[in-house]
């Protein structure tokens, strides 16, 4: 009985605009920051190193970025009202669901190989046929 009541309350706060996230994705998380009486949007850009799925109230993902040579990790509740939006900017090719090994890597070794997707480049158009010279 209590579980159903909790599930009903959580269902009201579930976000519908959450993109499909996976470990290795490059994301930009736009969060609402309140400073005094003003509110602004702050962007945190990095790689998803862990995604814990569960009930809507408990699902979270961890994003890691390098800031001036220091690794910064931040955990975000997926359905938080403080998150304005989540943009997926790329998909890394990984074979693990938790990428905690990236913590021990530095420089180019910490980069992930980006998945090859459909080419976004437009096909080359053929040049117009030249008029016959008379």
Curated annotation (Swiss-Prot):
Q: A Pfam family for this UniProt protein? A: Ribosomal_L19
Tell me which UniProt keywords the record has, alphabetically. Ribonucleoprotein, Ribosomal protein
Q: Which InterPro entries match?
A: Ribosomal_bL19, Ribosomal_bL19_sf, Translation_prot_SH3-like_sf
Kindly list any coiled-coil regions of this protein. none
Question: Pro residues bias located where?
Answer: 125-134
Q: Which SUPFAM superfamilies does the record cross-reference, listed alphabetically? A: Translation proteins SH3-like domain (SSF50104)
Q: Which GO terms describe its biological process?
A: translation
- One Gene Ontology cellular component annotation held by this UniProt entry: cytosolic large ribosomal subunit
GO molecular function list: structural constituent of ribosome
Sequence segments annotated as region (Disordered):
110-134
At the top level, the lineage of the source is Bacteria
Function text? This protein is located at the 30S-50S ribosomal subunit interface and may play a role in the structure and function of the aminoacyl-tRNA binding site.
Sequence similarity: Belongs to the bacterial ribosomal protein bL19 family.
The name on file for this protein is: Large ribosomal subunit protein bL19
Q: Which organism is it from?
A: Anaeromyxobacter sp. (strain Fw109-5)
């Amino acid at each position: 009985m209590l579980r159903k009541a909790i599930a009903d309350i959580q269902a009201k706060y579930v976000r519908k605009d959450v993109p499909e996230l996976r470990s290795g994705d490059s994301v930009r998380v736009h969060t609402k920051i309140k400073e005094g009486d003003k509110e602004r949007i702050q962007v945190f850009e990095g790689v998803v190193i862990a995604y814990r799925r569960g009930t809507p109230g408990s699902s979270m993902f961890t994003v890691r970025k390098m800031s001036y040579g220091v690794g910064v990790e931040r955990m975000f509740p997926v359905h938080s009202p403080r998150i304005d939006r989540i943009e997926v900017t790329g998909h890394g090719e990984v074979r693990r669901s938790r990428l905690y090994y990236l913590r021990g890597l530095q420089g180019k070794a910490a980069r992930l190989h980006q998945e090859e997707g459909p080419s976004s480049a437009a096909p080359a158009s053929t040049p117009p046929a030249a008029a016959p010279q008379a």
